[in-house]
Regions:
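Amphipathic alpha-helical segments typified by the pilin-like N-terminal helix
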Residues: 1-19
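Short, well-structured segments within or immediately adjacent to enzyme catalytic domains
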Residues: 15-201
Length: 201
């Protein structure tokens, strides 16, 4: 009975997390409509701050800590208020498999496969990601993915170039949000660099 209850609880948390990402996806689309089709990426503009006015709950006092949608119910440390990472990853060409960090807004129309390309995902808990409790926290800007070692299939764990997308949050994989606004679950070892590109090979 207990294993069955644990499995049911995990399934419920996974569904709740997916719903969070769906809601964030709606906010992304509404924000883009108001800002010439562009969305924030990187550290110049913090995504979880600019999307607050478009959220159906919380954020009315301009405090991102009140937006429950930003919290994955399966995140191990319940004090964490931002449980997702966004993509600030860009590439010089389709042959570039390393890429670089971008900190400028990006037009949604730049993404050739918006239903398949990842924008936001479950973030890994670990030494790279401290608990964020306020805007002055040292780790407030550690919320993005911009290197192959950051994705869920990576085995690296150091603070800077270690895995930033969870590899086991929900039954062996993360939930992810795509640029088109659709969200789904995927196996950690199936995540590839190409899934983060503006232009696919």
């Amino acid at each position: 009975l207990l294993p069955a209850l644990a499995k049911a609880k995990a399934a419920g948390q996974r569904a709740s997390c997916l719903n969070n990402l769906h809601q964030i996806g709606l906010a992304v689309q509404m924000y883009a409509e108001d800002y010439e089709g562009k969305i924030p990426r990187g550290n110049n503009v913090l995504w979880f701050l600019v999307y607050m006015p478009y959220m159906p709950q919380g954020g009315t006092d301009r405090d991102f800590r009140s937006v429950k949608i930003y919290r994955c119910p399966s995140y191990p440390n319940k004090k964490q208020v931002i449980c997702y990472v966004d993509s600030s990853w860009s590439f010089r060409s389709t042959r570039d498999n390393i890429g670089f960090e971008i900190n400028d807004p990006t037009p949604l129309e730049n993404f050739q496969r918006p239903t398949e390309t990842i924008y936001i995902a479950d973030n890994e808990d670990g030494p790279w990601r401290g608990i964020v409790t306020g805007l002055r926290d040292e780790d407030i800007r550690r919320h993005d993915v911009w290197h192959p070692s950051h994705i869920s299939s990576s085995k690296q764990t150091d603070p800077t170039h270690g895995r930033r997308v969870s590899n086991k949050r929900h039954n062996g994989g993360p939930n992810v949000l795509h640029y088109a606004g659709n969200a789904d679950w995927m196996k950690a070892d199936q995540m590839t660099v190409d899934m983060w590109r503006e232009k696919w090979k």
